[in-house]
Amino acid sequence: MRPAFRPVAAAGLIAAGVLATSCTAPRPGVTFYGNRASVAVEPGLWCTLGTNQQISSCLADPTKYAHLTLGSGQPLQISVPGDLGAPWLVAFEYKDAAGKTSSGRSELFRDGRLAYTLQPPGAGTQLTRVEVQAGFVLGLDPSGATVFAATRTWVLVILPRPPVVS
């Protein structure tokens, strides 16, 4: 005896197929490691480009960032996945021993490099924020100057580790 056709089961399979085709692949994450701890973070900004290599849409989520505790002068290791897409760079903010906030950035990595160690720039400096940037496009800033804008970012907020008291 042949089983009867079940419309409910067929509808369920169709719905599952629609869901499977409408799902997007997970976006690549970046891993930060320092002070014997690691944390992975999803992109906080992810823009797609149109056929003319101009930004067609962006998903920005300011809650997509990670925290890591580092002490003054401690380095930070950064690992990016192979599908991140070269080129990429690391932008960072730090406070010097006097408490003055400054910023800097790494070189632009275009050679398939997947890891970078960020050394704090000077004795007594405390890293406070690190951002991996990728997917650069040519654009204009508010003053009309030509800039390369990142279309993908991953953010780490660094919590200062209290000094060890002996």
Show the residue positions of the predicted features:
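N-terminal edge beta-strand
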Residues: 39-71
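Hydrophobic membrane-insertion alpha-helices, especially the h-region
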Residues: 11-16
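Bacterial N-terminal signal peptides that target proteins for export
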Residues: 1-10
